[in-house]
Amino acid sequence: VITVVGHADLTAQTLKLLETELSDRLRCLAQPGSMVLVRAGCGLPVAAGRAARRARLPLVVVLPSQDAVPALLPGRDQAAAGELLFLAAHVRLLPYDPADRDACASADERLVYSSSRLLAVWDGSPAHDQDATADVIASAHGRRIATETLWAPGYARHSRSPSSDEPS
């Protein structure tokens, strides 16, 4: 299983570029029986799902659950989840709160622990209250899970304003 995680605030241009790069990397890394695993959400998970389809690899989508029933995703992630479910060969339920950053980071770590390889889209920045990508990568390294980070010239994230750290 190849898990794909990364920044949630990638620009549209970066996501387009990533679809191609991820597809190429997935083709190179794929072994017989390989699958691609993502946590449902907008942005990178959709790019990874499309890349898995291009690479002809089955996609496993993880949805949040409460009491073994799928939980409602935040509004911006709902349409993306629909596309991911269309692309998915398998769906897994995982108990976590999709509106809680720490719960999402913990869910990502559980995905990584169940995989043989991590593909992380990461610009090298430290973790902060809106992004735990660095922590997930450190956790994978601690578990000796093969990890590859992707960040090419031209990739960008949306600018963070000082008020973006405040809950909405």
Where are these regions (language model features)?
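Acidic/glycine-enriched connector segments
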Residues: 1-167
